[in-house]
Regions:
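Short, well-ordered alpha-helices that flank and scaffold nucleotide-derived cofactor binding pockets
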Residues: 30, 34-38, 62, 99, ...
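NAD(P)+-binding Rossmann beta1-loop-alpha1 motif at the extreme N-terminus of oxidoreductases
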Residues: 1-75, 79-80, 148-149, 212-213
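Small-residue helix-packing motif on alpha-helices
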Residues: 47, 57, 217-225, 250
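Internal alpha-helical scaffold of NAD(P)-dependent oxidoreductase catalytic cores
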Residues: 123-134, 150-188, 201-241
């Protein structure tokens, strides 16, 4: 290839390049970066991260040597021309993180994807002292760390189908997604899938302790609880995906009248297990609403 042709090719690559900025480089951002890089290898993507913690920045650079790290907000200029910006800081740090970046022009054209808990699309615009921004709000969960997330997505009225597809492709790189029609549903998603892994871990803890109390050592009890939960979840997924049994039908198939499973489930039912789960989810939803005020 001649020098002029090479220059033209480089310019075209730069024009077609998807330029992504992460503001914040914590665990969820790390999971997303890893998923995007692993699943979008054929695409021309450049990822930069603004991370003020030197420890976190060094960890990110070691894990992903191909990304660019900014340690200070004033290192970022309009020349960077980001077209997708992930907000990935703690809620209490968002206003301070955005304040020095308000003056930059790319906010008006970029797709903003926020994984900041409790921060509405309107609040984000207020922090940026701007209006009519394209914002997709996301509630992922920690299984994103192994590309098994369940994420709820809401797009404000300024987001067109092209940008919705872009957000969908990026978030699908770390798991499953569900589009929401109402921003208030983010609070419900937070209660079910956002906090849901903790409910599963709590049940695993309880099952492990029950096994230990029956004479199994710690590692044996851990294996029994974990493989039982994993196997049951995969069996349920197989059935749901193939249109066979639902959760209730699967439970009923394990439960013989007058048998051991029936005896255990009877204790759950008598102690209002389903009601307890619902109350716990409602408490999480209400707390999410409060954090968003």
């Amino acid at each position: 290839m001649q020098p002029n042709q090479q220059n033209q090719q480089n310019q075209q690559n730069q024009q077609n390049q998807q330029n992504i900025l992460f503001i914040g480089g914590g665990n969820m951002a790390t999971a997303l970066i890893g998923g995007i890089l692993a699943n979008q290898k054929q695409q021309n993507i450049k990822i930069s991260v603004l991370e003020i913690s030197q420890i976190a920045a060094k960890s990110l650079q070691k894990k992903f040597p191909e990304i660019t790290i900014f340690s200070f907000a004033d290192e970022i200029s309009n020349a960077n021309n980001f077209d997708t910006i992930f907000l990935a800081v703690k809620p209490q740090n968002l206003a301070d993180a955005l304040q020095p970046l308000q003056k930059l022009n790319f906010w008006q054209t970029a797709l903003i994807i926020s994984i900041v808990a409790g921060m509405t699309t309107q609040k984000i615009q207020t922090f940026l002292n701007a209006t009519n921004l394209k914002i997709v709000r996301v509630m992922p969960n920690t299984p994103a760390l192994i590309n098994q997330a369940m994420s709820g997505l809401f797009a404000n009225a300024n987001v067109d189908e092209t940008n919705k597809n872009l957000a969908q492709n990026l978030l699908s790189s770390v798991g499953k997604i569900l589009w929401l029609n109402d921003e208030n549903q983010i609070d419900a998603i937070t209660a079910i899938s956002g906090s849901g892994p903790a409910y599963v871990f709590l049940f695993l803890e309880a099952l492990q302790k029950a096994a230990q109390n029956m004479g199994f050592d710690n590692k044996q009890a851990e294996l029994l609880a974990l493989q039982t939960m994993l196997g049951a979840a995969l069996l349920a997924k197989n059935n749901i995906d193939s249109g066979k049994d639902n959760f209730a039908q699967l439970r009923q198939k394990v439960t013989s009248k007058g048998g051991t499973t029936a005896a255990a489930l009877d204790v759950f039912f008598k102690n209002n297990f389903e009601n307890l789960v619902e109350k716990a989810c409602q408490a999480a939803q209400q707390r999410s609403v409060e954090l968003g005020k």
